[in-house]
């Protein structure tokens, strides 16, 4: 094109058409009343609709937004001030659709005529759904590594795990530990035998609302073999399971089935707590009616969190066993009570300091028999 040539209106329109239709980011044009004039979104689930049915409608009539009030305030602010908004995270789902939510980074600019008349808004929508999921999983795993295993107590370690997984990964998290492990005994080898009992060590739910519990914390029982819980401990493989009202294996555990249905749980992950071919316990994660189902990335995170926790549980188990042995030896090493009555008797016992500081043996005076 020669330097003195100009683009015709038709060519100018064609260039804009190509830019709009082939933009790598989603584009949305709204009028001053926030009604949709044109749309080009990269997610098929968001634009696979009849354009004739959405053009001219308010954006909140077409899409469910995670925070519609905040979005409305942002758009109104750009219309009034002309100052663009950059990088607002907005969760979007087609109106009334049961599918997953998508997360967009939204930047908005005001459209004006050469004379300054406001035409509307241009919204650029970058799909960051997968990026944010990965970032969230990395954050949760970092928290598990930092906060799980701070004590040498099996049950406390399990409680630390479920607190870090809810609500960032799951709506409900349950940890069950082989009962012998809680007492400091050696964990059984895999595959776990059907009759081996597990103790429900920790449960955490999002929202804190009261829900039906399959079994209370502290309950000890074996797992029905036909369930994915028992199968996970048999082959030490994680499972991602869809849950529904007619899921056949729920009949093998009626109380657990009742709790699952009451919570509206529709997605389940089961992961073994295992170390060096032995079985320490089981991690179960649930998502309920308020959230999307689990993905393979969530399974990967759960496996990594379970591996770290299994090591911490085994350390706590070893400490429990050694502490029990030390107390037993200490009791047997106490001096026998002297047969001769005395005015004051002393009993010697070494009491370890809870603060980790050195503590000596302190004689404890006891009253002597008789009138003295």
Positions of predicted regions on the chain:
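Sensory coupling linkers of modular signal transduction proteins
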Residues: 2-10, 111-148
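Sensory modules in modular signal-transduction proteins
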Residues: 7-48, 157
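Short hydrophobic secondary-structure edge segments in sensory/regulatory modules of signaling proteins
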Residues: 27, 173-175, 268
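GAF sensory/regulatory domain recognition
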Residues: 44, 52, 163, 176-221
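Regulatory sensory and allosteric helical modules in signal-transduction proteins
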Residues: 52-64, 73-89, 201-261
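… and, occasionally, acidic/histidine-rich disordered N-termini of signaling adaptors
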Residues: 95-99, 119, 187-188, 320-372
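Short hydrophobic beta-strand micro-motif common in sensory/regulatory domains
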Residues: 256-259, 264-274
């Amino acid at each position: 094109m020669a330097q003195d040539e100009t683009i015709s209106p038709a060519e100018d329109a064609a260039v804009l058409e190509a830019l709009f239709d082939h933009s790598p980011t989603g584009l949305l044009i709204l009028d001053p009343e926030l009604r949709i004039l044109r749309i080009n979104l990269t997610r098929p689930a968001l634009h696979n609709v009849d354009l004739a049915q959405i053009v001219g409608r308010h954006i909140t009539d077409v899409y469910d937004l995670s925070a519609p009030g905040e979005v409305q305030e942002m758009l109104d602010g750009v219309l009034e001030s002309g100052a663009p908004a950059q990088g607002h995270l907005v969760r979007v789902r087609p109106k009334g659709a049961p599918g997953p939510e998508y997360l967009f980074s939204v930047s908005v600019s005001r459209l004006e005529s050469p004379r300054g008349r406001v035409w509307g808004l241009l919204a650029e929508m970058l799909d960051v759904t997968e990026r944010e999921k990965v970032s969230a999983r990395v954050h949760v795993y970092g928290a598990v590594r930092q906060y799980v295993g701070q004590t040498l107590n099996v049950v406390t370690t399990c409680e630390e795990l479920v607190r870090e997984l809810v609500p960032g990964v799951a709506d409900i998290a349950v940890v069950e530990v082989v009962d012998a492990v809680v007492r400091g005994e050696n964990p059984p080898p895999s595959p776990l035998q059907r009759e081996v009992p597990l103790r429900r060590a920790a449960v955490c739910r999002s929202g804190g609302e009261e829900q039906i519990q399959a079994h209370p914390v502290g309950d000890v029982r074996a797992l029905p073999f036909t369930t994915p819980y028992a199968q996970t401990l048999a082959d030490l493989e994680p499972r991602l399971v869809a849950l529904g009202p007619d899921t056949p294996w729920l009949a093998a555990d009626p109380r657990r089935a009742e709790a699952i249905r009451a919570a509206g749980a529709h997605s389940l992950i089961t992961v073994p707590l295992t170390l060096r071919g032995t079985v320490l316990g089981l991690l179960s994660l649930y998502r309920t009616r308020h959230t999307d189902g689990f993905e393979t990335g969530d399974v990967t995170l759960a496996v990594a969190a379970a591996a770290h926790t299994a090591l911490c549980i085994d350390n706590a188990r070893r400490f429990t066993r050694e502490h029990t042995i030390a107390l037993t030896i200490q009791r047997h090493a106490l001096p026998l009570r002297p047969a001769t009555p005395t005015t004051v008797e002393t009993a010697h016992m070494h009491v370890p300091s809870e603060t980790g500081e050195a503590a000596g043996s302190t004689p404890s005076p006891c009253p002597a028999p008789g009138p003295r």
